[in-house]
């Protein structure tokens, strides 16, 4: 029998669902579960219904070409359809795996995790955040599997894409009050008339406040990371 730690290090090439041995103390990400990125990608594609249907059609067309290779008309028609369905498959793959998750609640939850856990650059906190965000996407039907982010660096890069190119004003409030205000608009909205005059209604956290606070945390740890790597470069920050 394998111990939990042995299970965590186990690798799998099959398309079967990997074992449920993800634990909070030593989370396993897709990079740890799958033998290679190719096997991970095949697993993800296999859980996309349009991809599977198109792959089945392409497989049938290839079989027809092989079986009836002496029939020029049959081969010609099959090759034509093969090219068409192959092109459609490429488009579906691009549309499925190309765009980033744009769900607002997902972004807010990610920012909440960053504000709460305060992950350092390349810190182990990113593994936990990545695992929790993968699970959130799966539980809320935003992704077909609990393995959206292949590794913690991918989740970190996704966060950086949210703040890249943005200009933030430094918040004067304390960290605790910032998070509290972002989590509860009811406490700061005042009366309905006051709310109508000062701000628009929001059913969830204040995204801009969350983004600003998370960006401040990232900037702080980026400075600390580079100062440790290259002492004496404070003038560049």
UniProtKB/Swiss-Prot annotation:
Topology of the protein relative to the lipid bilayer: Multi-pass membrane protein
Segments on the Cytoplasmic side according to the record's topology features: 1-47, 96-237
Presence of the UniProt keyword Membrane in the record: yes
COPII binding: annotated span: 236-237
Pfam families in the record: DUP (PF00674)
Subcellular location per the Swiss-Prot or TrEMBL entry: Membrane; Endoplasmic reticulum
A GO term from the CC aspect: endoplasmic reticulum
Keywords: Endoplasmic reticulum, ER-Golgi transport, Membrane, Transmembrane, Transmembrane helix, Transport
Stored InterPro entries: DUP/COS (IPR001142)
Gene Ontology biological process terms from the UniProt entry: vesicle-mediated transport
Extracellular face of the membrane: 69-74
Main location: membrane
Location of region: Disordered: 174-201
Disulfide-bond pairs as recorded: none
Family the entry assigns: Belongs to the DUP/COS family.
Purpose of the protein: May be involved in endoplasmic reticulum exit trafficking of proteins.
UniProt miscellaneous comment: Present with 1254 molecules/cell in log phase SD medium. Members of the DUP240 multigene family are specific to S.cerevisiae sensu strictu. Cells lacking all 10 DUP240 proteins show no obvious alterations in mating, sporulation and cell growth.
The protein's name in its UniProt record: Pheromone-regulated membrane protein 8
Species this chain originates from: Saccharomyces cerevisiae (strain ATCC 204508 / S288c)
Gene: PRM8
